[in-house]
Amino acid sequence: MKELFIGNYGLEQVGQKVTAKGWVANIRNHGKLAFIELRDREGLLQVFVDSAVADFDKLHDLHKESILAVTGEIVARDERFVNPHIKSGQVELRAETIEIIASSKLLPFELDNHAHAGEDIRQKYRYLDLRREKMTANLKLRHQVTKAIRDYLNQADFIDVETPYLTKSTPEGARDFLVPSRVFKNQFYALPQSPQMLKQLLMGAGLERYYQIVRCFRDEDLRGDRQPEFTQVDLEMSFVSEEDVRNLVEGMLKAVVKASKGIELTEAFPIISYAQAMRRFGSDKPDTRFAMELKDLTELSRGNTSLFLQKGLKKENGVVMGICAKNAAKAFTNRQMATLKQLVMDFGVAGFATATIEKGQVTGSLKSTFKDHNTELLELFEAEDGDMIFFVTGSLKRVQEALGGLRVRLAKDLELIDNDKLNFLWVVDWPLLEWNEDLNRYQAMHHPFTQGAFEDGSDWKENPEKMMSRAYDIVLNGYEIGGGSLRIHKRSAQEAMFELLGMKKEDYERDFGFFLEALEYGFPPHGGLALGLDRLVMILAEEGNIREVIAFPKNGQGADAMLESPSLVADQQLAELRLALRD
């Protein structure tokens, strides 16, 4: 085993005779001498090789990524040749002997950080991709994050408990990954979407403080920050308030940032309600690294005969709202403006329009529409010459979501986002339920085990759409990185929740009977949170896709190009499971 990684060699090793083992990152052969950049996981070390060294001739045919063992003396570099960009840049290894431990074929793509390689080939040769400095750094960062989490929770008297991967398929979630049972005819296990009920049962078992860094599985459509299998930091506590959980998680995240980024976060995380988040930012996971808040023009627009305004106001909960982009009047071409309009209209709003500010006046297609309210508009948006105002009309929720999406797009296009910022935010006071028009019933905003603002199940049936939950989400830079709540801990309340979700008694007793019975054996009040580890590390690593912080991820279609998974299986395996394939 190495006593010191070669990337960590420095002046303190000068004069020592060492054997350095690593991969050839680069080789420059000048005929009678050669320079090799030898790499291990901690960095690079320059090796100087004279032609008098045995096996020097073998270097002519050596490919990058071959593995060498080089024995020699560590010497200080001449000041003129010091490399300040690597940790070992003040020294080099003068080779005395070279052993080729393993040769490499020609690479399918260059591993230099700046070299462009397609996603498919990177996934197929992931073991090569992970040799790149950036990818190694991402995995080391992930390790630092998980270590900081474990250290913090262990210090807070949490118990790390594993829960099973072969569980029961239940409704009220994304699609399950199913595992057919060979022993139990025509029956299936499901891979867990989360250990939700199991961690609650651990509270019923009296453990009081539980955590687990656990793999979860959801058969859902993929995007940049999602994978079919992902890792979450799962925790649960008994006898706690919402504030207790938030304080614990906030302290943990501050410890994570300090351990992984060296940044001391001293301010308390801001807290806003779900309603405030939607009203101000058009999103339940707002990015607060930039301003551009939504403004409501509904009252200002009432009585205005403009067809643009009236078309939106006639909608149910019709509103007129807008955002102001600073210095954006000349920032976009006609084609870009058409793209922005399509982005907004895809949310199902009634109308979209823009105006620019010139010489203190609103100009453009809405100039006459707001001619009597020019001063009010400028004050409301704090608009100045050169700014552009985007107006959207339609039903409240769709307008808010459209402007929320537009707000983020504009911030990226106008380069308003400070990528060095880490803006955490708590979103609280969520509605307990939301109406699903496709299913024609209520569904839980979080999950069906979330406690309402009061517990008596009989009260929930009066005005379910107005019922608030005791839930909270933690947001970082516009990403929801975690969510949790206080949980229902009485059977009557849990049954009432299932019924509000349109479940029949025989159905919820079949699917959740074991859990309902557990609630009758002295179940403590409890709450917790699940934190998306992949997404958190992605943000801390300043990556745009969680695949960059997972060692062996699936691609955008949910396949593993390296393992060639999923794949067909033998007929014999299917027969043992009593399964037959259909086209």
UniProtKB/Swiss-Prot annotation:
GO terms of molecular function: aspartate-tRNA ligase activity; aspartate-tRNA(Asn) ligase activity; ATP binding; catalytic activity, acting on a protein; nucleic acid binding; transferase activity
GO CC annotations, alphabetized: cytoplasm
InterPro entries membership: Aa-tRNA-synt_II, aa-tRNA-synth_II, aa-tRNA-synth_II/BPL/LPL, Asp-tRNA-ligase_1, Asp-tRNA-ligase_1_N, Asp/Asn-tRNA-synth_IIb, AspRS_core, GAD-like_sf
Binding residues annotated for ATP, in chain numbering: R218, D219, E220, Q227, E480, G532, L533, D534, R535
PROSITE patterns assigned to the protein according to its UniProt record, in alphabetical order: AA_TRNA_LIGASE_II
Record-annotated site: Important for tRNA non-discrimination: H30
EC number(s) recorded for this UniProt protein: 6.1.1.23
Keyword hit for Protein biosynthesis: yes
Catalyzed chemical reaction(s): tRNA(Asx) + L-aspartate + ATP = L-aspartyl-tRNA(Asx) + AMP + diphosphate
Pfam annotation, one family: tRNA_anti-codon
Localisation: Cytoplasm
Residues covered by region (Aspartate): 196-199
Gene3D superfamilies (alphabetical): Bira Bifunctional Protein, Domain 2, GAD-like domain, Nucleic acid-binding proteins
Domain of life: Bacteria
Keyword terms: Aminoacyl-tRNA synthetase, ATP-binding, Cytoplasm, Ligase, Nucleotide-binding, Protein biosynthesis
Binding-site residues, L-aspartate: E172, R218, H446, R487
GO biological process: aspartyl-tRNA aminoacylation
SUPFAM superfamilies noted in UniProt: Class II aaRS and biotin synthetases, GAD domain-like, Nucleic acid-binding proteins
Assembly information from the UniProt record: Homodimer.
Role played: Aspartyl-tRNA synthetase with relaxed tRNA specificity since it is able to aspartylate not only its cognate tRNA(Asp) but also tRNA(Asn). Reaction proceeds in two steps: L-aspartate is first activated by ATP to form Asp-AMP and then transferred to the acceptor end of tRNA(Asp/Asn).
Family named by the database record: Belongs to the class-II aminoacyl-tRNA synthetase family. Type 1 subfamily.
Name of the protein: Aspartate--tRNA(Asp/Asn) ligase
Gene: aspS1
